[in-house]
């Protein structure tokens, strides 16, 4: 693929199951299409018991698209990272166009953790997550999955599998099988973030029973106080 990294190129790449990663040393962006490909079946998401208890206690306030820049910069803030300045720039542009999204966990007004990814029709491509308070990124993932299911998404791509992700139900399929799942997802027109925070945290109630819609929160709004 060409080296000119633009939002339009990214959208086309994701629609074909391809994603970029930057080289921390050279800044070069390389394109990836793993085989096998990892994804999280939304109807088989497993929440460990201890995490389920934390979500129910609502230790964090959870929002979407309220602090995208802070989330992606926090995800990049580690000793070695593929989230280079070029990656940050183009994903920020994607966010401004409504394709890249962040999920934030707040505690007493401070950003405690979160994740970001790309939403394209009925597919969500998870990119990275971080935490400053224990379990904050996991709580963000729980809320993301609840919201995706409620909104009608059909595919949550995790790109690669890790032992950590497998605890939540992540599995792998051959690349051709993933591409078929992606094709079906691209025929879906879902709603982004339809549930209120309390509804997403109510793990005892199926998401299908909620009908109230919460507005999508954009990155220029102020963080909550707790």
From Swiss-Prot:
A single Gene Ontology CC term: cytoplasm
InterPro entries on file: Acyl_CoA_acyltransferase, Leu/Phe-tRNA_Trfase, Leu/Phe-tRNA_Trfase_C, Leu/Phe-tRNA_Trfase_N
Example GO BP: protein catabolic process
GO MF terms, alphabetically ordered: leucyl-tRNA--protein transferase activity
Cellular compartments annotated: Cytoplasm
EC identifiers of the protein: 2.3.2.6
Catalytic activity: N-terminal L-lysyl-[protein] + L-leucyl-tRNA(Leu) = N-terminal L-leucyl-L-lysyl-[protein] + tRNA(Leu) + H(+); N-terminal L-arginyl-[protein] + L-leucyl-tRNA(Leu) = N-terminal L-leucyl-L-arginyl-[protein] + tRNA(Leu) + H(+); L-phenylalanyl-tRNA(Phe) + an N-terminal L-alpha-aminoacyl-[protein] = an N-terminal L-phenylalanyl-L-alpha-aminoacyl-[protein] + tRNA(Phe)
Domain of life according to the entry: Bacteria
Keywords annotated in UniProt: Acyltransferase, Cytoplasm, Transferase
Family: Belongs to the L/F-transferase family.
Function noted in UniProt: Functions in the N-end rule pathway of protein degradation where it conjugates Leu, Phe and, less efficiently, Met from aminoacyl-tRNAs to the N-termini of proteins containing an N-terminal arginine or lysine.
Name of the protein in question: Leucyl/phenylalanyl-tRNA--protein transferase
Organism: Salinibacter ruber (strain DSM 13855 / M31)
Gene name, Swiss-Prot/TrEMBL: aat
């Amino acid at each position: 693929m060409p080296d000119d990294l633009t939002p339009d190129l990214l959208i086309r790449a994701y629609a074909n199951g391809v994603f970029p990663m930057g080289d921390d040393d050279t800044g070069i962006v390389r394109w990836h299409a793993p085989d096998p490909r990892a994804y999280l079946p939304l109807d088989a998401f497993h929440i460990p018991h201890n995490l389920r208890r934390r979500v129910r206690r609502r230790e964090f306030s959870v929002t979407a698209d309220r602090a995208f820049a802070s989330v992606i910069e926090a995800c990049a803030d580690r000793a070695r990272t593929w989230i280079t300045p070029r990656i940050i720039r183009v994903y920020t542009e994607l966010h401004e166009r409504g394709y890249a999204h962040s999920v934030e966990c707040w505690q007493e007004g401070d950003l405690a953790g979160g994740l970001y990814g790309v939403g394209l029709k009925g597919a969500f491509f998870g990119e990275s997550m971080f935490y400053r308070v224990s379990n904050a990124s996991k709580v963000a993932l729980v809320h993301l999955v609840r919201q995706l299911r409620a909104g009608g998404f059909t595919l949550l791509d995790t790109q690669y599998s890790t032992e950590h992700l497998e605890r939540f139900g992540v599995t792998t399929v051959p690349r051709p099988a993933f591409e078929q799942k992606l094709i079906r997802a691209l025929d879906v027109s879902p709603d982004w973030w339809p549930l209120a925070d309390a509804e997403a945290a109510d793990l005892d109630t199926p998401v299908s029973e909620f009908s109230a819609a919460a507005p999508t929160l954009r990155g220029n709004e102020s963080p909550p106080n707790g």
